Amino acid sequence: MSRRKARPARPSGSARTARPGGSASSARPRTAAAPAVTADSPCPCGLPAAYGACCGRFHAGPGTAPTAELLMRSRYSAFVVGDEPYLLRTWAPETRPADVDFDPALRWTGLEIEETGDGTAFHQRGTVTFRARFTHDGSPGELHERSRFTRHEGAWVYVDGDFLD
């Protein structure tokens, strides 16, 4: 991760801070005060499945997302639920930060996948272009990014991304 911008900690994860327009702060808790999501709740990633059967299975277990898009979705859900260990585990070693700084005033409210490039079981690299909606202190916002993914030791990991707006 060669570039870091003061933007929301992105669902794909390429910024360390979780504050729109803010900076990382070590005084913040390392876990977000996330909304209650249970195994039976609708999955935050937007697929028509319960969290436990969708992204929650990747968060809880040793299984890995089989495509770059599913990794993107599971990382978005990890931001929603404040799952720092999963985010760090699915981050490419060469760009992984020491920690993820969640902003308790930030709430992720929706994910739209616009486009995927490669990123299947037959590829070593892939891209996912998405829009992630959020509120910060009640004000709405949106993050538009093209994220890059690669395989590391056989599993998909997030590398970095480019802001599109």
Q: Where on the chain are the PLM-derived regions?
A:
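Secreted/processed peptides and extracellular or luminal domains of membrane proteins
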Residues: 49-51, 60-61
